[in-house]
């Protein structure tokens, strides 16, 4: 995916230098996302080694050189559907100061395109009830019920 610049906003893959451009701060508007630069670099390098599985996109305010939105696609390799692939969209967030500019929609559209190019037979996501209308605008439909269990944090070795 090449960088797309529109209205002073660039859309591109996550880069190793993005910790210093506010990636953590952007994610924190979605959920708890505190991590050190060292943790970011370690995880970034792990993800980079699986470039056919993980696709992380950021939107950058070019003037401020600051990340203002992000999202990710994880491609799950399955045995069902003739050893098909299922895309999972995760961690869609737009900085509060930039909402209403269709940035989330544009990130979703790019992730859907990546999923299609990766050969996914479907793309799924989980969202809160408050975000259903947004994802319907992105052409997603309600399907099934989400279930989850949060596990305790394992002790550090």
From Swiss-Prot:
GO biological process entries:
UDP-N-acetylglucosamine biosynthetic process
Q: Which reactions is this enzyme annotated as catalysing?
A: D-glucosamine 6-phosphate + acetyl-CoA = N-acetyl-D-glucosamine 6-phosphate + CoA + H(+)
- UniProt-recorded Gene Ontology molecular function terms: glucosamine 6-phosphate N-acetyltransferase activity
Q: Where does substrate bind?
A: 31, 78-81, 90-92, 121-122
Q: Which Gene3D superfamilies match?
A: 3.40.630.30
Question: Which pathway, metabolic or otherwise, does it act in?
Answer: Nucleotide-sugar biosynthesis; UDP-N-acetyl-alpha-D-glucosamine biosynthesis; N-acetyl-alpha-D-glucosamine 1-phosphate from alpha-D-glucosamine 6-phosphate (route I): step 1/2
* Entries under PROSITE patterns matching the protein: GNAT
Pfam families named in the record? Acetyltransf_1
**Keyword line:** Acyltransferase, Transferase
Q: Where is the N-acetyltransferase domain?
A: 9-157
Binding-site positions, acetyl-CoA: 100-105, 135-137
Which EC numbers characterise this protein's activity in its record?
2.3.1.4
Q: Which family does it belong to?
A: Belongs to the acetyltransferase family. GNA1 subfamily.
Identification of the protein by name: Glucosamine 6-phosphate N-acetyltransferase 1
Q: Which organism is this entry from?
A: Dictyostelium discoideum
Its encoding gene is what?
Answer: gna1
């Amino acid at each position: 995916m090449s960088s797309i610049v529109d209205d002073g906003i660039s859309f591109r893959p996550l880069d190793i230098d993005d910790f210093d451009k506010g990636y953590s701060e952007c994610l924190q508007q979605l959920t708890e996302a505190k991590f050190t630069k060292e943790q970011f670099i370690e995880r970034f390098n792990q993800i980079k080694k699986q470039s056919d599985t993980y696709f992380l996109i950021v939107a950058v305010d070019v003037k401020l050189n600051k990340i203002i939105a992000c999202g990710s696609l994880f491609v799950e390799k399955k045995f069902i559907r003739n050893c098909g692939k299922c895309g999972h969209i995760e961690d869609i967030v737009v900085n509060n100061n930039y909402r209403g500019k269709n940035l989330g929609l544009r990130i979703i559209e790019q992730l859907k395109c990546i999923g299609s190019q990766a050969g996914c037979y479907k793309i799924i996501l989980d969202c809160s009830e408050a975000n259903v209308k947004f994802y319907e605008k992105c052409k997603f439909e309600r399907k099934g019920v989400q279930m989850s269990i949060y596990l305790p944090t394992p002790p550090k070795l």
